Amino acid sequence: TVQVVSPSVWGWRENRIKDIESHVDLTMCLFKFECNFYASKNMNSFFLGHPFSKLQMGDKNAILSKHGLEDSKDFVSILPGSRRSEISQLMPIYIQSAKKLLEVNPNIFFLIPAANSELADAIASHQDINQIPHSLATEAAQDFLSISTISIVTSGTASLEAAVLGSVPIICYKTNAFNYAILSRMVKTPFIGLPNLLLQEHVFPELIQQDLSVDAIVSSYSEISSKPQRYQSHLAAMNDSMNGEGFTAAAQAIKHLL
């Protein structure tokens, strides 16, 4: 049996590894650190690579024209999440942070992609959103991230997408105290952001629970802005780490099992 895409046993509910060991002969992994985890358990795995490694930054001029944006602005993307609960919890903090960031850099223009029209409406309904210069659009994440040097991102695959497209992510997460108490006991990794997990180093800011505040977001923005080359080199290293052995080699690995 070949398992395509490993469950996140390296991060939480590690006891599931027993079922995988009993029923799976080879696991195809999206990330190299997953292969290292399986090797530590004396289990077979193959580094396929992540589909995001194929993402390409869009053409800036085409994106500006498509969305009616001015080239002179400093773009910062805000990705508040793909669930209404995340948007409800985090969007007020993001809007207040955006106001504060405009005091630091009045030339910022905020780009807010939404996964669908329902989530766009949820974002647009938030108080004070019209007090910040912004563009809110559906199905625009890749466009917006391609032209944003920095992004404020709710933790999840969006943080990886941002990093791949050259936008340094400020990774944020907050939930209610009960949920956090459960999650913090289950999660076994030192980082929650995929970009940091890939680098195995705390490179990109992670503002989690009580550490998430307006001041923390502004401080993270200032830190990243002051060292652009350092962060871009980390993005390049992260992107390199995502290139797996590919489908042809994967087919050969499967053939050897037969």
Regions found by a protein language model. Give the residues of each.
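Nucleotide-activated sugar donor-binding and catalytic core shared by glycosyltransferases
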Residues: 1-258
